[in-house]
């Protein structure tokens, strides 16, 4: 069930955003894409998610041509650095939204949402409005929504960058526990960061990118 990127090139202007990227990601592992701002991290994640089409190259997942699969059919979840939630919905409704879109069984939705809420430490916050939550809590909602989907690929684009130091430290530790647990052993986790110390603390494989090219 590995995710394989082969010779991915994306050059929308006179500069490469992705320059001949070839990578292999295995399930049950945490990968950190480390690079400065505008190094190509977000572009790489968006390409995997299907939000951006490369000029050339290929992506294979589960022995299928991933580039040929529409975005809405890819089993991918993405957490952004901005707190992206549905402001008109409460915490529980935010988390269950993608499951209802899939028309899943209500009992299964209830269980998956309850499990996700428990994992991110939001038990008791189910009826809270998004506007009533702190930045850290809002990011937990976004993470819980991704976990409830049970996506096979979870992409995290600098998810802690807009939080204060104490919140970053706490959530980083929770990420490590979540992504190394047995329940998530079949998923691939790719985390983008500009911070070398954060990359080391996450205890995963570190991939360095600069000017759209993999350095190590």
Locate predicted features.
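Conserved ABC ATPase "signature" region
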Residues: 107-125, 176-180
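Helix-to-loop junction immediately C-terminal to a conserved catalytic motif
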Residues: 49
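A short, proline-enriched helix->beta-strand linker immediately N-terminal to the Walker B motif
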Residues: 148-152
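ABC ATPase NBD coupling module
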Residues: 53, 65-80, 101, 106, ...
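Conserved ABC ATPase signature
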Residues: 129-133, 137
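Short coil-to-helix segment of the ABC ATPase nucleotide-binding domain corresponding to the Q-loop/switch region
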Residues: 89-98
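Hydrophobic anchor residue at the start of the ABC signature
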Residues: 143
């Amino acid at each position: 069930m590995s995710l394989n990127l082969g010779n991915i090139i994306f050059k929308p202007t006179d500069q490469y955003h992705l320059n001949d990227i070839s990578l292999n990601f295995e399930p049950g592992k945490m990968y950190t894409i480390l690079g400065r701002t505008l190094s190509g991290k977000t572009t790489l994640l968006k390409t995997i998610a299907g939000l951006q089409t490369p000029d050339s190259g290929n992506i294979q997942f589960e022995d299928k041509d991933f580039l040929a699969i529409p975005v809405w059919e890819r089993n991918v979840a993405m957490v952004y650095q901005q707190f992206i939630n549905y402001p008109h919905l409460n915490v529980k409704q935010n988390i269950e939204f993608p499951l209802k879109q899939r028309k899943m069984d209500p009992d299964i939705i209830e269980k998956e949402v309850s499990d996700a809420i428990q994992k991110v430490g939001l038990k008791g916050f189910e009826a809270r409005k998004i506007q009533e939550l702190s930045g850290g809590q809002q990011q937990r909602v976004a993470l819980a929504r991704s976990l409830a989907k049970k996506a096979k690929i979870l992409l995290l684009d600098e998810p802690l960058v807009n939080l204060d130091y104490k919140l970053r430290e706490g959530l980083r530790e929770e990420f490590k526990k979540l992504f190394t647990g047995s329940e998530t052993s079949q998923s691939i986790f790719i985390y983008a960061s500009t911070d070398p110390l954060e990359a080391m603390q996450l205890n995963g494989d570190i991939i360095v990118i600069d000017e759209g090219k993999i350095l190590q």
